[in-house]
Amino acid sequence: PWSHENPYLYQLEITLTDSEGEVTEVVPYKIGFRDFILDPTDRVMKLNGERLVICGVNRHEWNAASGRCISLEDMKWDIECFKRNHINAVRTCHYPDRMEWYTLCDEAGIYMMAETNLESHGSWQKMGAVEPSWNVPGSLPEWKEAVVDRARTNFECYKNHPSILFWSLGNESYAEDDIAAMQQFFKEKDDLRLVHYEGVFHNKAYEDVISDMESRMYAYPQEIIDYLENDPKKPYLLCEYMHDMGNSLGGMNSYMELLDRFEMY
């Protein structure tokens, strides 16, 4: 089965015929087979029957010279950088990426969190405090179909990529009925992947209907320990941490060593 260690892909040939049986189009496509579940017996994420250990990064589409216009060579360089640094997973922060990136991750065995392009943290944070009175999309009916359509577009474009293990509902957009509707869409369409969303941490009233995992940003190691040692309902995933600029990134081992202590991390 497909995995980071063995990203084997099969060559599928899709043939389209007309009503007379004549071939009108032939499309080659690479596919992979793998089994990914959240085991209900121990609440551990498992790929092909084994615990999934994620050593991942967030990746923006960015080139220092060309800005957000990146090339195929830029993407291949990133894959090589991942391999050199033992990185096995990537989050497409905070929007879908170029289609070639998903194929490269299929071929390289990079586990992907495919994020939907939704971010609105300016609408529910005031001077750094959580204050959702202006929250968008929130539970506003006029926004519901718009955000569900973004989830639908993300799903329909990339649903056949074995590298995608997680659908992400977006980034820093709080959590109310509209984001719950996005979760419901993915659950109805795809039972082979998990759904991720960090923003529900700020509105626990929705924790049972949004996100298959407890997701956090920039939590201290002790906060992670406190969660995992107190009968956690969900596995724990840090979707952002160690945001490093300049001469930084010290103390990373305090996070990594928790992988050996907690199977739900």
Q: Where are the language model's segments positioned?
A:
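Substrate-binding/catalytic cleft of secreted carbohydrate-active enzymes
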Residues: 80-82, 89-265
